[in-house]
């Protein structure tokens, strides 16, 4: 796989996304898609997601972030391309 076939993004997810199993569900979906990175709660109530993997898989994860698990109410997902960072080794819940 060529490097240009990979995508590295950071996403910030707003809404009712803490205390609803959002991070663990994100990890489960990411692992199924073979996407590396992390999901962590932020003090302002959002969840930050770092994702690295095949472009199609990362795009599928981004699509899923807009819905999240059943108990979540996602109001916004902002994404930004990441450049110059070492890709993560697995997917962690922080």
Curated annotation (Swiss-Prot):
Record keyword Hydrolase present? yes
SUPFAM superfamilies given in the database record = Acylphosphatase/BLUF domain-like
Q: Which organism is it from?
A: Hahella chejuensis (strain KCTC 2396)
EC supergroup of this enzyme: hydrolase
Q: Does the keyword Nucleus apply?
A: no
- Which residue positions are annotated as catalytic? 23, 41
EC numbers listed for it are: 3.6.1.7
Q: What GO molecular function terms would the record report? A: acylphosphatase activity
Report what the protein is called.
Acylphosphatase
> What InterPro entries does the entry give?
Acylphosphatase, Acylphosphatase-like_dom, Acylphosphatase-like_dom_sf, Acylphosphatase_CS
Listed disulfide bonds for this chain? none
Top-rank taxon, per record: Bacteria
| Swiss-Prot/TrEMBL keywords | Hydrolase
- Where are the membrane-spanning stretches? none
The record's comment on protein family reads:
Belongs to the acylphosphatase family.
Residue ranges of every copy of the Acylphosphatase-like domain listed in the record: 8-94
């Amino acid at each position: 796989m060529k490097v240009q076939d990979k995508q590295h993004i950071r996403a910030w997810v707003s809404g009712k996304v803490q205390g609803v199993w959002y991070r663990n569900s994100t990890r489960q979906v990411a692992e199924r898609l073979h996407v590396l990175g992390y999901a962590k709660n932020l003090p302002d109530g959002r969840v930050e997601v770092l994702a690295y993997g095949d472009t199609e898989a990362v795009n599928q994860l981004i699509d899923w972030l807009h819905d999240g698990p059943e108990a979540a109410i996602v109001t916004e997902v902002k994404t930004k391309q990441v450049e110059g960072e070492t890709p993560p080794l697995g997917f962690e819940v922080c």
